Curated annotation (Swiss-Prot):
Organism this protein belongs to: Homo sapiens
Gene: ZMYND12
Lineage top rank: taxon: Eukaryota
Sequence ranges of the TPR repeats: 172-205, 214-247
InterPro entries: TPR-like_helical_dom_sf, Zinc_finger_MYND_domain, Znf_MYND
Entry's Gene Ontology molecular function annotations: zinc ion binding
Xref: SUPFAM superfamilies: HIT/MYND zinc finger-like, TPR-like
Binding site for Zn(2+) 2: 28, 31, 50, 54
Positions with a binding annotation for Zn(2+) 1: 17, 20, 37, 41
Keywords: Cell projection, Cilium, Disease variant, Flagellum, Metal-binding, Repeat, TPR repeat, Zinc, Zinc-finger
Entry protein name: Zinc finger MYND domain-containing protein 12
Length: 365
């Protein structure tokens, strides 16, 4: 039974909705430790994150057992903290994935869950809360709730300002989200300032040619594209494409060499791998398909640039073991190369990609 009866709740105990913190009227029947104000929020949370972590919440929201020694108690506490850290990262990754897929409503419960565990583990004033605030801000922007997004961003900014040990990666995320806020408000001057800072801090943390830096270049390119400064936009889109090409081509070349032997020491086929988590894969799809759409709108002027992005997508989906998508983009690249009568070497390179895909024995996912 999902309904909560008020008289059955111990006196002084307040049960709150997992999504909005209003007084709870329902409980999840599967875990019995998660509460909701109504069916709408229960379904929203279930579809977003709760289904994936339902049983994992039970040991975190029930009393710790009695331990016979201090050593056992410390071990139990360490296990509890490890579970919390795992759920922080898991919920964060899922929320990021939803955002890159444009599912802003679904991202909110997952981001709230990540924030909730961060507060319990690190406290209310910790800089560790900032990534979760930024997820909630980005989700709010996607839903058109600019005032709410500003509140989350200012909370994140204030936390960073108070911190003495904030990482370059966190500074990068903060400036990227501030850039997105000002893009939504059509204040492109401020947006460019924050995205430039995003690129700087990301470069300090990961390097100028890292895929984690490419997001800043991409958003900056979008600003120049909207401002009709097409040469600047083109340069930055090319930069982003080259970063992703270098990353994916490295994985692709390693895999191609491995396939010469076909089998590993255990007699199993080598598995394709992008080296990315779910959120990064979703980000790659969003960035590369956006650039492809722009390239295709001007493919008559620079077909090589369109083919270059198509080849990146071929490698990406091949590494994801999605042969049908890889073949689709490969055929589009080959068709465009023939249509534009590009050199034979370009066509043969695409043919090699298609040949490797056609001999791949992995199932389509």
């Amino acid at each position: 039974m999902n309904v909560i009866y008020p008289l059955a709740v111990p006196k002084g105990r307040r049960l709150c909705c997992e999504v909005c913190e209003a007084p709870a009227e329902r409980v999840c029947a599967a875990c019995t430790v998660t509460y909701y104000c109504g069916v709408v929020h229960q379904k929203a949370d279930w579809d977003s994150i709760h289904e994936k972590i339902c049983q994992l919440l039970i040991p975190l929201r029930t009393s710790m057992p009695f331990y016979n020694s201090e050593e056992e108690r410390q071990h139990g506490l360490q296990q509890l903290q490890q579970r919390q850290k795992y759920l922080i990262e898991f919920c964060y990754t899922i929320a990021q994935k939803y955002l890159f897929e444009g599912k802003h409503e679904d991202a909110v419960p997952a981001a709230l869950q990540s924030l909730r565990f961060r507060v319990k583990l690190y406290g209310l004033s910790s800089v560790e809360l900032v990534p979760a605030y930024l997820l909630l801000a980005e989700a709010s922007l996607g839903l058109g709730r600019i005032v709410q997004a500003e509140e989350y961003l200012f909370q994140a900014q204030w936390t960073v300002l108070k911190s003495t040990d904030c990482s370059n990666a966190t500074h990068s995320l903060l400036h990227r989200n501030l850039g997105l806020l000002y893009i939504a408000k059509k204040n492109y001057e401020e947006a460019r300032y924050h995205l430039a800072n995003d690129i700087y801090f990301a470069s300090c943390a990961f390097g100028t040619e890292d895929i984690r830096t490419s997001g800043g270049y991409f958003h900056l390119a979008n600003i120049f594209y909207d401002l009709k400064k097409l040469d600047l936009a083109d340069t930055l889109y090319t930069k982003v494409s080259e970063i992703w090409h270098a990353y994916l081509n490295n994985h692709y070349q390693v895999l191609s060499q491995a396939h010469i032997q076909q089998m590993d020491l255990l007699g199993k086929l080598f598995e394709n791998d992008t080296g990315l988590d779910e959120a990064q894969e979703a980000e790659a799809i969003r960035i590369l398909t956006s650039i492809l759409n722009i390239r295709e709108s001007t493919s008559d002027k620079a077909p090589q640039k369109t083919i270059f992005v198509l080849k990146i997508l071929v490698m990406f989906y091949y590494l994801m073991m999605n042969s049908s998508k890889a073949q689709e983009y490969g055929m589009r690249a080959l068709s465009l190369a023939k249509e534009q009568q590009l050199d034979v070497h370009e066509q043969s390179t695409i043919q090699e990609l298609l040949s490797l895909i056609s001999t791949e024995d992995h199932p389509i996912t």
